[in-house]
C-alpha cells in the first residue's frame, strides 16, 4: 500500500504538471497554470507534513521538513515552476525508494500450509477425522506412517521413529518409546501409533513457531538509515544559510532561492539508487535482498549467527566411520550392514546403501523392527543391523554420534557411524567474514553439544549454542550484548523462521530450504553455496561506501550552490535546474554500486 501511494503521488505530479505546461505554453493561461501548480504544491506539502509528523513520532528523522519549506517558499514568491520541479524530484525519489524497499508478499504462508489441519480422533474402535482446533487435551489420536503429529502429546503405543527436522533443524531420526512425548510438527516414521493429546493445537510447538515469527515481525529492530543521519545537520545548514541571506538582503525571494538549491536531492535520490544498484549486483550473484535497508544493516553487522544443519553442513547424514571390532574388514562390515538394510526405507539405510562400494548381497527372511533395526539372512548367516541392544545382548562401546551396529551369527562385529557432512566452502566463508570485519561468529544448533562444538572448531566459529529449539534460538539472539550488534542470522529450515525474523538481518539458504524461512528472511541465497553469505556482506559494504560518497558529493555541491545563491545570483528556476544537474552527478556516481570493485 505504501509503495502504491508513492507511485500515485508521482504520477499525480506528472499529469498535473503536464496540464499546467499545456495551460501556460499552449493555451497561454499563465494564471490558471500557477493556480494549478500552487494547489498541487500545497496539497502535497500538506501530505508530506502529515507523513513527517508520523516519522518524527516513530523516533526517526527525515528530510521532509526542508523539502516542504522549499515547496512552500517557492510558491509564496510565485516561483511555481521551480516548485513543480522540486515536487517532481521529491515524489520521484519517494517512489524510487519504495521500489527499492520491496517486501515479501506472504510472510507465513508456508508455515500455515504445512501446519496440521486435521487429526484422527479415536473413540474406542471408531476413528473420526476432526479439525485440528477441535482437539482437546486428553483426546486419543491416531497418527499414521508419514503423517505430521497434530499436537504435542504422549505416545500410547510404540515404539516409533520421528523426524523433528521442522522443529530442531536436525535430520537424524529420533526414536520414541511408549510414554515419551512428541511435538507437533514432527513427522511420524513407518509405524502407526496412538498418542494422548497433552496440548491443544494453539498451545503446541508448531503453532508456537508461527507465533514467534509473527511476534518478531511485529517488533522490528530500530534502525537509523544513513540518509536520516545526514538529514538533521544538512537541514540546519540550509536554514542557517537561507536565513542569513534573507536577513542581510531583506528579500524573501533570496530565502526561496537558497532552499531550492538546498532541496535534499542527494539524500532522497543518491542513497536509494545506490541501494537499488547494490541489490541488482547481489541478484546477479544469486542473492535476493528484499529491501535497501537490509543492505545498510548488513554492512554494519558485527555478529553472524548460523544454524548448523543445512547451513554449515549439507543436511544429509553420510557414513563417517566404519569401526570393526573383529577381524572383519571395514568394506565387509559396511557391505553386511548395507545388504541387510537395502530394503528398508529408513534414512540411515539409504545412507548405508549409498556409501557401500561393494556389491550388495542378497538378503532373505528380512524382518524390520520399528525403531530397533533389521534382521536378515545373508549367505546363511543371521545378520542384524540397528541399535546396539537390538544386535547383541552384551555391552558394547557405543559411538558418540548416530550409528548402526552390526552382528553376524550372534557375534557383534562393529558399527558404522554417521555425520552431517560439512559444506566444503564453510571454512572459507567464515574466514572471509572475519576478513570483512565480522569478529563474532556464532553457531546455534538443535544438535548435541559435542557434535556442534566439533563442527564449529572445524570451520572457525567463535561461539556455540547447542540443543536449541526455535524459542531458544531467539533467546540467544536477544541476549547478545550491544557491542555485538547488529546481528545477522543464517538458516534454511522452518525451525529457523522465527530467528531469521528476529535478527537484524535474516538470511535464508533458499536453494533447498523451506519457503517459510525464505519469506521470513530479509535476504535469500538462491544458490546452494554458503560463500554467497560473505559475498552479500562484501556487496553491502561496497554499496554503502558508494552511497555515502554519493551523498557527500551531493551535499558538498549543494552547499556551494547555497552559498552562491545567498548572494542572489541564481534565480529560483535556474536553481531548480542546477538541482537536476546535482541529481545527475549523484545518480551517476551511485550507479557505481552495480559494478564489482
Model regions and ranges:
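Actuator/coupling domain of P-type ATPases
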Residues: 10, 20-32, 37-124, 136, ...
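Membrane-embedded alpha-helical bundles of multi-pass transporters
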Residues: 1-6, 21-29, 35, 49-57, ...
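Residue-level signature of catalytic and energy-coupling elements of molecular machines
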Residues: 52, 79, 100, 119, ...
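Bilayer-spanning, highly hydrophobic alpha-helical transmembrane segments
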Residues: 14-16, 223-267, 272-275, 548-580
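Conserved ATP-binding TGD loop and adjacent catalytic N/P-domain core of P-type ATPases
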Residues: 380, 408-549, 587
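Juxtamembrane helix-loop transition segments at the membrane interface in multi-pass membrane proteins
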Residues: 53-56, 99-109, 273-292, 591-597
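Conserved catalytic phosphorylation-site environment of P-type ATPases
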Residues: 68, 167, 267-340, 480, ...
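P-type ATPase nucleotide-binding
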Residues: 25, 144, 319, 323-440, ...
